[in-house]
């Protein structure tokens, strides 16, 4: 049984030439939405996903706009509104050392080098130079952990544990 990963949600159409507006859920949109790549559209009322090939990708405002080969007008893509774009695990590809997919990090337990449990990674923000991991503490408060060498000392995706050395004031 193939495992599937969300890479985006089609929220609307764009224009009349078959483009769809996507809220991206992928770590690497420029790679995932590259021309010629195959994506799979999962619609609520359909049992089988629809395989589509990316014809074009561009960013407009805060959305990714995608067009698919063979879908060149609004009437053909209207049915995809609300559908999820996914890829099979086999398409994920290898990452360089120190790089991780979001799904590998979200859900990890964060501990200090002294063994104090900080909380669980709930979300990943991508504001610019480095990612920021949103960690929910047991008391419900959130802590923002920058993914930089000075702070993150070890990531073990097998045991879902991240070891950090907090900078002064980071956990306050």
Swiss-Prot record:
Location of the protein in the cell:
Cytoplasm
Which segments constitute the PRC barrel domain?
96-170
Entry's InterPro entries?
PRC-brl_dom (IPR027275), PRC_barrel-like_sf (IPR011033), RimM (IPR011961), RimM_N (IPR002676), RimM_N_sf (IPR036976), Transl_B-barrel_sf (IPR009000)
User: What residue ranges carry the coiled-coil annotation?
Assistant: none
Pfam families the UniProt entry points to? PRC, RimM
Q: Name one GO molecular function term.
A: ribosome binding
Primary subcellular site in the record, as a coarse category? cytoplasm
Q: Does the keyword Mitochondrion apply?
A: no
| One CC-aspect GO term | cytoplasm
Q: Which UniProt keywords apply?
A: Chaperone, Cytoplasm, Ribosome biogenesis, rRNA processing
Keyword set includes Transferase: no
Its GO biological process annotations read: ribosomal small subunit biogenesis; rRNA processing
Homology family: Belongs to the RimM family.
Oligomeric form and interacting partners:
Binds ribosomal protein uS19.
In the record's own words, the domains note is:
The PRC barrel domain binds ribosomal protein uS19.
Task performed by this protein? An accessory protein needed during the final step in the assembly of 30S ribosomal subunit, possibly for assembly of the head region. Essential for efficient processing of 16S rRNA. May be needed both before and after RbfA during the maturation of 16S rRNA. It has affinity for free ribosomal 30S subunits but not for 70S ribosomes.
Q: What is this protein called?
A: Ribosome maturation factor RimM
Q: Say which species the protein is native to.
A: Geobacillus sp. (strain WCH70)
């Amino acid at each position: 049984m193939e495992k599937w990963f969300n890479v985006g949600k089609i929220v609307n159409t764009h224009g009349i030439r078959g483009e769809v507006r996507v809220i991206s859920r992928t770590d690497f949109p420029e790679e995932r939405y590259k021309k010629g790549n195959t994506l799979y559209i999962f619609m609520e009322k359909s049992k089988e996903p629809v395989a589509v090939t990316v014809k074009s990708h561009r960013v407009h405002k805060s959305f990714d706009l995608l067009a698919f080969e063979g879908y060149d007008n609004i009437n053909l893509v209207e049915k995809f509104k609300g559908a999820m774009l996914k890829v099979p695990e086999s398409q994920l590809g290898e990452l360089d050392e120190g790089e991780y997919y979001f799904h590998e990090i979200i859900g990890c337990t964060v501990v200090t080098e002294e063994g104090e449990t900080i909380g669980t990674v709930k979300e990943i923000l991508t504001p610019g130079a480095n990612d920021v991991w949103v960690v929910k503490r047991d008391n419900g408060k959130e802590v923002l952990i920058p993914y930089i060498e000075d702070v993150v000392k070890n990531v073990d995706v097998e045991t879902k544990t991240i070891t950090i050395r907090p900078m002064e004031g980071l956990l306050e």
